[in-house]
Amino acid sequence: MLRIADKTFDSHLFTGTGKFASSQLMVEAIRASGSQLVTLAMKRVDLRQHNDAILEPLIAAGVALLPNTSGAKTAEEAIFAAHLAREALGTNWLKLEIHPDARWLLPDPIETLKAAETLVQQGFVVLPYCGADPVLCKRLEEVGCAAVMPLGAPIGSNQGLETRAMLEIIIQQATVPVVVDAGIGVPSHATQALEMGADAVLVNTAIAVADDPVNMAKAFRLAVEVGLLARQSGPGSRSYFAHATSPLTGFLEASA
C-alpha cells in the first residue's frame, strides 16, 4: 500500500496519457497496467467540457487524475496552469513540471522550487518533477511537497536509470515518497527502481509507443510487483569476494 498525502494506492505504477494512438487504446493500457493515478497535460485537455476526448474516458475509467503543468517555462506559468486545473477538474493534486528548453525537457530547479513553495501555501498537493539532485529533492520536501519525482533519464529517452547513484541518495534521505519519473524504457527498469527503494514509478512513453501497449502495460504492472516483492524479501548484500554456497572440502575429508 502506497500513501501520498490524503490518498492510498494499491498500485505502485503511475501512468501517463500522451503518445497513444487513440483514446480507447490509452484507456485499455491504463486498465491493463493496474494504475490508479494517471497524469495528463493541461495543455492537451479542453477544460471547458468533460466530454473532451482524453478527459471523458479517464473519468469513466474511475482513475485518480494528476494534472501536470507540462509546457510551463516559468513558475508563474505553472502556478497559473495549476489554478486552471483545480477549478476545472476539482482536484488540488498537481504534478509540477517546468522545463524551459523544449529540446531537452529538463526541469528547471530554481523555478520548480519557487512554484512548489507557492503552490503548497495555496493548498495544492504538489508532486514535482525534478532532476535527480538530492539537495533539491530535500528542499522540495522541506517546503511541503507530498512526494518528489526525480528523473531516471530525460523524458521519453527510454535510457533507464542513468541517475541511479543520485536516486539512491534521494531515496535514502527522503521522508516523503519517491516516484522515479522519466526515462524508464522497459519493465526491467521499473523493477530496478522498486528494488532500490523507490516508492513508485511513472511510465508513459515506454507503454504508449510499444507495438502492443496493452501487453506492455501488463508487463510494467508485473515488473513493479516483482521489484516491490524483491525489496520486501530482503535481498542479500553485495560483496567483492566469492562466498561458497556449500562446503568446499568437507566431501574430501569425509572420504579420506
Curated annotation (Swiss-Prot):
Instruction: Give the UniProt entry's GO cellular component terms.
Output: cytoplasm
**Organism per entry:** Shigella flexneri
Q: What is this protein called?
A: Thiazole synthase
Q: What family classification does the UniProt entry report for this protein? A: Belongs to the ThiG family.
Which interval of the chain is the signal sequence?
A: none
Pathway linked to the protein: Cofactor biosynthesis; thiamine diphosphate biosynthesis
Q: What is its EC number?
A: 2.8.1.10
**Quaternary structure and partners:** Homotetramer. Forms heterodimers with either ThiH or ThiS.
One molecular function GO term is: thiazole synthase activity
- One Pfam family per UniProt: ThiG
Instruction: Identify the residues that bind 1-deoxy-D-xylulose 5-phosphate.
Output: G156, A182, G183, N204, T205
